[in-house]
């Protein structure tokens, strides 16, 4: 019982343990008729397959696990293009998005782009 109380103290939140994060996958393909298929999962959670029309946003929230090993990866298909990528990796993404605790991924014609504020995107993945 003492371990649980200490683990949930404010210091735990400072170090990112139990911190809540949000991840968004947005269909930003130029063609209005192009549907994007997204399936995201972690070792513990399969979030299922989602069909996104132009402008649609699939999102979820979660807390980083005690061991700070939380990882979500996504398989994205857009027409002939597809990519599997890490949508959240606690070792990298949490430090990149620690100010907002939110990660945005835009699926575009040129690849998959990343942002912490849904305004300033940079290309993260090339279609393969």
Residue spans for each PLM region:
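Intrinsically disordered, low-complexity segments enriched in small/polar residues
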Residues: 1-60, 64-67, 75-128
């Amino acid at each position: 019982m003492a371990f649980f109380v200490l683990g949930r103290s404010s210091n735990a939140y400072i170090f990112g343990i139990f911190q809540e994060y949000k991840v968004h996958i947005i269909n930003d393909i130029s063609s209005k008729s192009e549907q994007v298929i997204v399936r995201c999962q972690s070792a513990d959670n399969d979030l299922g397959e989602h069909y996104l029309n132009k402008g649609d946003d699939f999102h979820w929230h979660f807390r980083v696990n005690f061991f700070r090993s939380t990882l979500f990866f996504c398989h994205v298909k857009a027409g002939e293009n597809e990519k599997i990528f890490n949508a959240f990796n606690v070792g990298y993404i949490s430090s990149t998005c620690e100010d907002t605790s939110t990660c945005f991924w835009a699926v575009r014609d040129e690849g998959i782009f990343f942002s912490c504020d849904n305004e300033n995107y940079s290309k993260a993945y090339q279609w393969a």
